[in-house]
UniProtKB/Swiss-Prot annotation:
Subunit description: Forms a cyclic heterotetrameric complex composed of two molecules of XerC and two molecules of XerD.
Subcellular location, record wording: Cytoplasm
Keywords: Cell cycle, Cell division, Chromosome partition, Cytoplasm, DNA integration, DNA recombination, DNA-binding
GO aspect biological process, one term: chromosome segregation
Organism annotation: Pseudomonas fluorescens (strain ATCC BAA-477 / NRRL B-23932 / Pf-5)
Active site (UniProt): R146, K170, H237, R240, H263, Y272
One Pfam family named in its UniProt record: Phage_integrase
This protein's name: Tyrosine recombinase XerC
GO MF: DNA binding; tyrosine-based site-specific recombinase activity
Domain annotation Tyr recombinase: ranges: 106-285
Length: 298
């Protein structure tokens, strides 16, 4: 068994040309399987069956191995058996149909409402960068936008009169979102300054030279605001998570939050229900802590 394992690793190195890091990880995983086989007196790769491999996976899971690590181990086993089958040394694959135990999904990091208001209610200096960055922060939180969605926004997608923004999301799906009062005010402060930079295209958020801000530039501005106002690391998706969590906590309307976020599967939205946690515009108007829009169409 050791010879065949060594031959497979040599095949990965010379023919598949996998990286040293990947090769080391695969060998380490397969050595675990080999050690298990020796303890269970499984004397050849042909004798390892699905029940035996399932027993190993269960044992490793109980010892604290993550689902991700176990998935990699199963991938290594499948690769080994694909090689053994191709070489005529085996006729089955014990990993076929096996999946690692499901791990707990990591919960999104959010700001609570007080911390969010602390971030957004800080004093704004009267200059180009300050007004632009404030508009970016307010729009992220007001609409729960993805970084890619905000980066790609053009001026003609914004309707301040009606308080709406058209967003092009994942899968070429378009959704129209309400823009809260605070975000509208910040945008109204920003747009005259934007015009002074003479942007050559319709980008909503631009540099002082009129060029569209890229994702990295926006990430850095959000990070700087987090460090300045909150003394913590902040990234755009944390504002999206906070938007979703705060709305869901107040409204308990999972479907509305799903549509506002642009999630195709409600299971993706359900991750926010951990925060203890009317349609769309009504939920937005009544629940969002910074989006109370005046009646009568301000």
């Amino acid at each position: 068994m050791q010879q065949q394992l060594d031959a497979y690793c040599a095949h990965l190195r010379s023919e598949r040309q996998v990286s040293p890091h990947t090769l080391q990880a695969y060998r380490r995983d397969l050595e675990k399987v080999l050690g298990f086989c020796e303890k269970m007196q499984v004397r050849s790769w042909t004798d390892l069956d699905i029940q035996g491999l399932r027993s190993l996976i269960a044992r490793l899971h109980q010892q604290g191995q993550s689902s991700r690590s176990l998935a990699r181990l199963l991938s290594a086993v499948r690769g080994l058996y694909h090689y053994l089958n191709r070489e005529g040394l085996c006729t089955h694959d014990p990993a076929n149909g096996l999946a690692p135990p499901k791990g707990e999904r990591r919960l999104p990091k959010t700001l609570d409402t007080d911390r969010t208001l602390q971030l957004l209610d800080g004093a704004v200096e009267d200059d180009f960068l300050a007004h632009r960055d404030q508009a970016i922060l307010e729009l992220f939180y007001s609409c729960g936008l993805r970084l890619s969605e905000l980066t790609s926004l053009n001026l003609d997608q914004l309707d301040l009169a009606d308080g709406l923004v058209q967003v092009h999301g994942k899968g070429s799906k378009t959704r129209v979102l309400p823009v809260g009062k605070k975000a509208r005010s910040a945008l109204e402060q920003w747009l005259p300054l934007r015009a002074l930079s003479n942007p050559p295209d319709g980008a909503l958020f631009v540099s002082q030279k009129g060029r569209r801000l890229g994702p990295r530039a926006i990430q850095l501005r959000v990070k700087a605001a987090g460090e300045r106002e909150l003394g913590q690391n902040l990234h755009p998706h944390m504002l999206r998570h906070s938007f979703a969590s705060h709305l869901l906590e107040s409204s308990q309307d999972l479907r509305a939050v799903q549509e506002l976020l642009g999630h195709s599967d409600i299971k993706t939205t359900q991750i926010y229900t951990h925060l203890d946690f009317q349609h769309l515009a009504a939920v937005y108007d009544s629940a969002h802590p910074r989006a109370k829009r005046n009646k009568g169409g301000e």
